[in-house]
Design a protein with these regions (language model features):
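ABC transporter nucleotide-binding domains
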Residues: 2-5, 12-189, 194-208, 212-214
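Short, Lys/Arg-enriched, disordered terminal segments
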Residues: 1-3, 300-304
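ABC transporter nucleotide-binding domain
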Residues: 173-261
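Non-catalytic surface loops within mature trypsin-like serine protease
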Residues: 29, 125, 142, 235, ...
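Generic beta-strand hydrophobic packing signal
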Residues: 8-10, 23, 251, 283
């Protein structure tokens, strides 16, 4: 498998704080790679290093086979388009003027591609409308159009649907999928909206505390998903000893929710709980989702 990006024991430290603590990561060519982690896990720091906005303290990475210490890394970085944190756009310009400005920055001799980029992101009808009058979703799509001005092979997006309304989220999803499937652009997405990420990603990287906990493909995740029962109870504190006594495998999700992986008649469970003063509020059968996999991997306490 060919990888467009590989990190090797990547470290980024600040005064008294380590943002990345030896992170290893591999992004396959043509993938939509979802970077998953809590706020403060190191996602944005990683993206800023990849884009050349920060330098690593230790370790390294390769981008299209070129090491970050090689002088040729600047040429490899030109194959990246990125929207990090907020789109780098000018609010007193039109959408087309923003793209033309990026062409000038990149040294592109012709503006002929501007109209095509606006059509691609669904902003071709904005005309003379200033960006300050755009919705957040329109601004995000313009940010992607600006990132595409250099005709990149890798698109890096930091929280691209954050703050968008449902329609804006749908439009962003369709755009990302179009860029990946029709143009063959590899996409690296950092997001905490796991349900939306599960509709996009072909591969996932779960990071916590500045380290890679697990990398897995969407197909592997689907195979690993198991049926379970989601139990909502009045309090998980009295529930846990009951499940331990019954030899059940489970994950505590919150103070009133548990994922139960061991098949068990609801009537038996209800009787057991009534004896310890715990009320069973709701039971639903479900397959493990990206969210439950994440909770099990990083956020929940697993028992077996």
């Amino acid at each position: 498998m060919e990888y467009v990006l590989e990190t090797n024991a990547l470290i980024k430290s600040y005064r008294g704080y380590t943002a990345l603590g030896g992170l290893d990561m591999r992004v396959p060519r043509g993938a939509v790679y979802g970077l998953v982690g809590r706020n403060g896990a190191g996602k944005t720091t990683l993206i800023r290093i990849i884009c050349g906005l920060q330098a690593p303290t230790g370790g390294g990475y390769t981008l299209y086979g070129v090491k970050n210490t090689d002088r040729a890394i600047r040429k490899s970085r030109r194959r990246i388009g990125a929207v990090v944190e907020m789109p780098s756009i000018y609010s007193d310009m039109t959408a087309e003027e923003n793209i033309r400005m990026q062409y000038r920055v990149l040294g592109v001799p012709s503006y002929d591609g501007a109209a095509g980029l606006l059509r691609l992101v669904g902003l071709d009808g904005t005309g003379k409308k200033k960006v300050r009058n755009f919705s957040l979703g329109m601004r995000q799509r313009l940010g992607i159009a600006v990132a595409l001005a250099g005709d990149p092979d890798l698109l890096v997006l930091d929280e691209p649907v954050n703050g968008l309304d449902p329609q804006g989220i749908i439009e962003m999803r369709e755009l990302i999928l179009k860029l990946n499937r029709e143009r063959g652009i590899t996409v690296l997405i950092s997001s905490h909206i796991l349900d939306e990420l599960s509709r996009l990603a072909t591969h996932y990287g779960f990071i916590d505390g500045g380290r890679m906990v697990k990398e897995i493909s969407a197909e592997e995740l689907e195979r690993a998903a198991r049926k379970c029962m989601s139990l909502r109870v009045s309090d998980t504190v009295p529930l846990v000893p009951v499940l331990d006594r019954l030899g059940a495998e489970y994950t505590v999700i919150s103070g009133n929710e548990v994922k139960l992986y061991t098949p068990m008649p609801v009537c038996v469970l209800s009787d057991e709980l009534s004896g310890v003063g715990c009320r069973l509020l709701n039971v639903t059968e479900q397959d493990e989702s990206l969210e439950s996999f994440y909770m099990e991997l990083l956020g929940g306490e697993r028992h077996a």
